[in-house]
Amino acid sequence: VDQKYLIFLIITVFVLSGTIRVFTLIWQNKFAARISNEITYKAYDVVLNQDYPNFIKQSKTDLIAIIHTFGNNLLVDVINPILFLFESTIFISLISFALFLYNWKIFLSIVFFLSAIYFLLFKKANKILKSSSLKQVNFNEKLLDRLDVELNSIEYIHLGNYQRICSNNYAKYDREYKLNTANYLITARLPRILIENLILILILFLILFLYINNNISQALPILATGALLAQKSFPYIQKIFENWSSISQYKNAALSVLNYSIRYQKDNKYNNENRKLLNFDEIEFKNVNFFYRKNSKILNNINFSIKKGDKVAIMGPSGTGKTTLLRLICGLLNPSSGSVLINNKEINKNKNNEYTVHWMRSIGYVPQKINLTGKTLRENITFKNNKKANNKIKIEDVIEITLLQDLVSRCNGLDSNILQNSFSISGGENQRLAIAR
């Protein structure tokens, strides 16, 4: 290529690359956000729709980490870097093409030099990042688990004066987590500093060599062109390495989200809109046995009947199966053997799924531990369901039935922020909120 066209060629490449960068910046981030949202939505839907026995075996903290924390990692540290890899590759290809047309010998020399260096870096970094990726997931789950347990045990911590012990233990895990993150960042960014300095030293030695041999004036245009191309292309080469490092670091976190997302099923014919409310006449247990694990029977040959209008209390020591029995009545669990009948019709998701789902829609369940779900009483009563939240008459009826008028008055209405204003809600009021829900 004639040198008089070189400047024009370089300007064209830079204008084109700048235009591409603007459009790709906007497109990549919005596209990555949509993809990440779709994946985490599907993963969360799968978590909520999995069989109840499988769900209760899992750590809720781990599930929160997978859906929220790792879902965010998926966007920032995996999908975005993958898209930026494409952008960097396109730009480097344009620069390489221009350099090849200008001087193919210089092009091949640079390619060989950088390939050799980055091959060694990739080989070394891969071992570090492989270990770091597994640690990242483990540390994150430990931190969330510790926070969940301790913040839900604040009475025990205050009574035992364990505040400093808990904060010191948290600091230990957090330190390990952040040092692991720091090691990843060092691994990803150190090559840029090393290679930039190495290239600068080589250029200075080359200039010195040419100066000694009185050839610097002839080589100056080539050096200037090479320096300009290097200044524009090297950040993208390093970006490729950093993006690869990010993907390697967070791939295990991303895979944990994808593992749920791929099991997503779009159609759910038993959603709320298609469920029928069943009238209740009789609940009957016939020879019901249940065990969570083999050789660990919880219920043994249970037989009883509850008629409409009966008031029944199930009593017994802890661990004898009272909660399990209620879960069987609700249809959350299937008997290991025997039958649970509602109106002389068996409820069992493995045998009669449609009828069981309709029954589950028709029954109310108030657990021992009630979690507040929103900032206002309205959000707690309606479970953040906008359609229910706007049904004023229905909400007023529910409040009257569950005797929550005093609580609503004390909290200055349904829409006051009960968490921000530190309203005291008793255990009994919590239970009635759950009944209202």
Give the ranges of each region predicted by the language model.
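Hydrophobic alpha-helical segments in the permease module
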Residues: I10-S17, R21, L114-I117, R192-I199, ...
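Juxtamembrane loop-to-helix connectors within ABC transporter transmembrane domains
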Residues: Q28, L48-L94, N180, R189-L190
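Short intracellular "coupling" helices and adjacent cytoplasmic loop segments at the cytosolic face
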Residues: A33, Y41-G71, R146-N169, N243, ...
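Transmembrane helices of ABC transporter permease
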Residues: L83-L134, F205-A219
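Cytosolic ends of transmembrane helices, especially the final helix of ABC transmembrane type-1 domains
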Residues: F139, L143, E155-Y162, I186-R189, ...
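The feature captures the beta-strand-to-loop junction immediately N-terminal to the Walker
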Residues: M315-P317
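Helix-to-loop junction immediately C-terminal to a conserved catalytic motif
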Residues: C330
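Conserved "ABC signature" C-loop
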Residues: P367-N417
